[in-house]
């Protein structure tokens, strides 16, 4: 099982719609709104690192109004 935490910076005021979309993504196991440089932190889990990468790059980063992400792989 591969895991990562992803910090998400998004357009101001768009946090709640993004949080709702994130909760619909298979593999996203936790979603938390935060204050500071990043607006949302998520935990992503997948069977392997390749699947994990696809979830982050093809689904999370493609959500409208997501500006930047920082991925922290769990070792």
Outline where the language-model segments fall.
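A compositional/biophysical signature of low hydrophobicity enriched in polar/charged and small residues
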Residues: 1-75
């Amino acid at each position: 099982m591969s895991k990562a935490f992803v910090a998400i910076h998004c357009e101001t005021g768009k946090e709640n719609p993004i949080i709702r979309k994130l909760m619909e993504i298979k593999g996203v196991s936790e979603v938390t709104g935060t204050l500071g440089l990043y607006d949302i932190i998520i935990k992503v889990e997948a069977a392997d690192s390749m699947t994990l990468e696809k979830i982050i790059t093809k689904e999370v980063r493609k959500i409208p109004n997501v500006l930047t992400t920082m991925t922290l792989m769990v070792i």
